[in-house]
Structures are given as C-alpha cells and as structure tokens.
C-alpha cells in the first residue's frame, strides 16, 4: 500500500534494452499479483508482438485464479507455454475468505479448465498450511481440490503442488498470531502429502526447520543479532538450502546467547508493544486490528482500486495516492513481419577459438553462450520448430572441459544473405572472452556437416611426464584399456614436457584426449589436471 504501477511504455523500453544486452530467451514479469496489473493484457500483446520473431517467451509469477483470462493465455503461448502457477492458497472457500482471497472453488476449476484447453499439460498449484483458524477439514480439502483440477483436463495433465507453511509477518493483520511449531508443521504436512499420492501429481514442500527459523527472524527483535553472530561463528552457512541447514547448530546458538526462539513464535496480545512498533509503514494499528477481526468473521475487504478507499492510513490523497497505469485506448498492431512467409534459410560455417578461461566451459554451457551471443548480435536468426524454439546451430564436435582449441566449427542458419565477413564483426563484440570467430564462409544449400577423421592436439606439462619409451610402447600395443581396440593415434614426443597427439576419429566410441594421455603415461588425476591441452585442428 498504496498500489503503484509502472507505465507500460517504460516496461517495454526496459525489456527491449535488457533483451538486447543479455540475449536471454525468456522474460519474466515480476510482481506480487501480476493479474492485478491494469495494463497486463495490452503489455503482454505488445511484448509478444515484439519478441515472437526472436522467439522470446514470457512468463508470469503465480496468479490469482480469478485474474487468469483467455486473452492472457493466448498471449503467453505464442512462443511457448511457460510455467503457469495458480495460487488457491487454501483448501476451502471459508479459509480463503479468512485471508481475504475470495476465490470460490468453481472459479479455480474454471481457470484450470481454460489453461488445459489452451494447451498447457502442466499446472503448478500453491497452498499454505497452518493459516489462522485452519482446521483439519481445511487441510483435508487440499488433495480433493487437486484431483478436481486434474479432472478438468481432457488429456493426461500433470500437477506440481507446492506446500508452504504460514509465517506471520510484521505490519499485517496476522502479526499477533501464533505460528505452528516444528512438530505441528510436520504433522500438517504428513497428512496432506499422503493425500496427494497420485501418479499425475508431484508434491513439494518447504522444510519445517527453515519455516521455524524464518518465523523466528520474521517477528524478532534486536536480541537476535547476537544469535546470528553466534550461529555464524559455529559454522552456519547457506541456510536457505536445506542440505546446508544445521538446525542443531542454530539451537546451540540460541542456547549460548540465552535467547528463547519459541518466544518469537507465540501468540501476541493486541496490547503488547511489538519490536517494530516504532517503524511507521503508514498503515495504522487500528486498521490492522479491524482487518484481523474482519478476517476471523470471514468478511472481505475489497480492493481499494475498484471499491474506493478503505482508510488504511497510507494515502493522504495529496502527496501519496494510488498510482495506476491506464492501458492505451487501442490495442497494439501486430508487426507485419510476424505473419510474413518464413524466409529461406542461408547457412554459414563459422570457425572459432576456445581459449584461456573459456576452456572451463562445458559443451552445454558453450552452446548456451552461443545462443545468447547470437541473439545479442542482432543477426537475422532462423529458429527451430517445436515446443522450445532455438537458433538453428549445429556444432561439429564437443570439446572436453579444460581443453583449448584454435579451430572449432559450427554451422548457423540466417534469414538473410549477408557478407561472410559481417558475421565475425557482429559476434566477436558479444562472445565471452576466449571465444572468437576467426573465419566465416557461406555454404551451399545441401552441403552436409563434415565428417571429421583426425584431431591434432598440442600438450604441455609443467613437469616432465611424457616418456618416449611409454609412447613407443603404446604405439606397439594391439589393444588399449579405454576401448576394445587400440585407437589409431600418432604420438610425437618432443621432450618430456611437450608432445603432439594425433587422434584418429571413428563414428562412435572415440577416446577422449585426457583419457588417452592418462592411460598412455600412467598419470594421476592431479597430474592430468595440470596439463595444458590445445586442439590445433580437426580434419
């Protein structure tokens, strides 16, 4: 409070700048409630008109079921169907009214039915456990609601159900409420997740220990500073990841500092002085108490954007007031090029280096870097068909992590005929350090990727590891432990620190250069890790 909305024109300009600078293929519009943004439908259509040719998909955070419309779904699926999350939050209409989410079950089912009809096969649902006034019946209603949502699909749909534990927060109507303790949270979760056992439902939940700790700090006071320092000294790190959270160590920190964590999870009296009372959020204490009473009666407090001011105390209607964005009067025109016939692709072959720090990029990471760089370059790309369109790029080989190369190759398809010299100029400005286009040629239409037969490597070691006798013994062998037959290889040992390795390639079961060197010269893992391997060429 008060509601403040950014202008759609500003959002369009910022997204254009961000996409051009990063080359990302997905854009997320982040807000607490995306469906409540006044210009959402207009903004989505304009973003998709601009981004569909570049195959940029749009995703939204969790939506209230009553704000999901066919128009929003139609825009979201224009490139690909990104994840869709609905937030029923509670299993019954009664409990949703308590938290001022007046969502009848039929509205939730209608939204799910629309999403499945629009082609989504997976929906994500979010529920909270331990809400104020919650009863076992409210929790028991969650699995049946999930199954009803599944039944709104005519196909074999999937549901991902996330279960979170309620944590009272300061400056809210529930800031006085008790938070469920660790054992209660485990009990709530046990009953619900058992009811969600279904081959088409995947349930996820937050760690009860994380909820307990977050609850303590959410309504804590300055005494928790010494607890935080003690926990750090005891070795607590990265506690947001459940595998790193050490609850016993946190309990030790509370014990050493003499602070009772359960003190912060208890029910508070409305007359109690709260640790955050000296902070003025604008919302009066009287308004929060009145909202608390309305919640327990199941009475809705309407949205002040639609039903007028509710006198929360934030707005003075002079300097501070609602700031809503008015959608343009007319819908944006779709770009003419979007409906044009697809262009005839033009293929180019690029030769590039992978040196220095770039050698630590795995092949999939390198592919991702090229995809983003191609988008950032502004070149007219051609995209693949299917669920997840990507730039049409074909890599001729996958270089092992840690190996450098002077001459890797890939083929890329463009929508226009360009001078080959223009491609290195466009790409080298945006490729990561160590990756550089050194040659580009235009290919005939039907030319297949080359079948590589030989790779030549230059290998250097900081210590004398390459024994000429070991190389000669290897070349004289009939078999090799890594494969069923000895790979065709040529070794030239210049001195014990330098060698040149020629590896003959086959259609399958090729030996990795590191494996070959390790077995030929009986190297340890540490010795192999210190080698500097440079791929000179492939033919």
Predicted ranges, named:
Residues 38-39, 68-72, 94-99, 129-137, ...:
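Flexible glycine/acidic-rich beta-alpha junction loops that bind and position SAM and/or redox cofactors
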Residues 339-356:
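Residues forming anionic-ligand binding surfaces in small-molecule and nucleic-acid pockets
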């Amino acid at each position: 409070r008060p509601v403040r909305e950014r202008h759609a024109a500003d959002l369009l300009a910022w997204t254009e700048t961000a996409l051009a600078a990063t080359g990302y293929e997905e854009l997320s519009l982040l807000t607490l409630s995306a469906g409540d943004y006044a210009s959402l439908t207009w903004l989505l259509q304009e973003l998709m008109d601009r981004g569909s040719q570049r195959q940029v998909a749009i995703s939204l955070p969790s939506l209230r079921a009553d704000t999901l419309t066919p128009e929003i779904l139609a825009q979201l699926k224009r490139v690909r169907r990104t994840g869709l999350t609905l937030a029923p939050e509670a299993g019954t209409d009664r409990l949703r009214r308590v938290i001022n989410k007046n969502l009848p079950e039929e509205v939730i089912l209608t939204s799910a039915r629309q999403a499945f009809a629009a082609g989504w096969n997976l929906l994500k649902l979010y529920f909270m456990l331990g809400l104020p006034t919650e009863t076992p019946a409210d929790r028991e209603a969650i699995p049946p609601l999930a199954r009803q949502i599944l039944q709104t699909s005519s196909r074999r749909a999937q549901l991902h159900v996330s279960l979170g534990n309620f944590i009272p927060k300061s400056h809210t109507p529930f800031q006085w409420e008790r938070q469920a303790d660790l054992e209660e949270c485990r009990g709530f979760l046990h009953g619900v997740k058992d009811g969600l056992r279904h081959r088409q439902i995947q349930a996820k939940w937050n760690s009860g220990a994380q909820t307990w700790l977050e609850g303590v700090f959410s309504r804590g006071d300055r005494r928790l500073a010494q607890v935080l320092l003690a926990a750090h000294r005891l070795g607590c790190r990265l506690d947001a990841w459940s595998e790193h959270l050490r609850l016993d160590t946190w309990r030790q920190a509370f014990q050493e500092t003499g602070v009772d964590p359960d003190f912060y999870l208890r029910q508070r009296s409305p007359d109690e002085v709260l640790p955050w009372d000296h902070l003025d959020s604008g919302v009066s204490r009287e308004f929060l108490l009145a909202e608390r009473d309305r919640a327990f009666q199941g009475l809705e407090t309407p949205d002040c954007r639609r039903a007028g001011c509710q006198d929360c105390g934030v707005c003075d209607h002079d300097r501070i007031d609602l700031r809503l964005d008015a959608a343009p009067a007319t819908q944006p025109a779709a770009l003419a090029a979007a409906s044009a016939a697809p262009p005839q692709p033009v293929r180019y072959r690029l030769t590039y280096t992978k040196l220095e720090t770039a050698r630590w990029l795995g092949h999939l990471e390198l592919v991702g870097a090229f995809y983003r760089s191609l988008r950032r370059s502004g070149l007219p790309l051609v995209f693949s068909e299917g669920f997840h369109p990507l730039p049409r790029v074909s890599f001729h080989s996958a270089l092992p992590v840690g190996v450098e190369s002077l001459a890797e190759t890939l083929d890329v398809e463009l929508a226009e005929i360009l001078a080959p010299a223009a491609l290195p100029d466009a790409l080298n400005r945006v490729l990561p350090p160590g990756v550089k286009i050194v040659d580009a040629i235009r290919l005939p239409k039907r030319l297949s990727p080359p079948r590589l037969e030989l790779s030549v490597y230059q290998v250097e070691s900081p210590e004398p590891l390459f024994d000429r006798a070991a190389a000669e013994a290897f070349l004289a062998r009939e078999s090799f432990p890594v494969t069923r037959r000895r790979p065709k290889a040529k070794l030239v040992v210049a001195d014990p620190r330098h060698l040149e390795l020629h590896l003959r390639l086959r259609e399958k079961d090729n030996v990795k250069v590191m494996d070959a060197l390790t077995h030929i010269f009986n190297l340890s893992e540490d010795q192999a890790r210190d080698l500097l391997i440079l791929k000179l060429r492939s033919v």
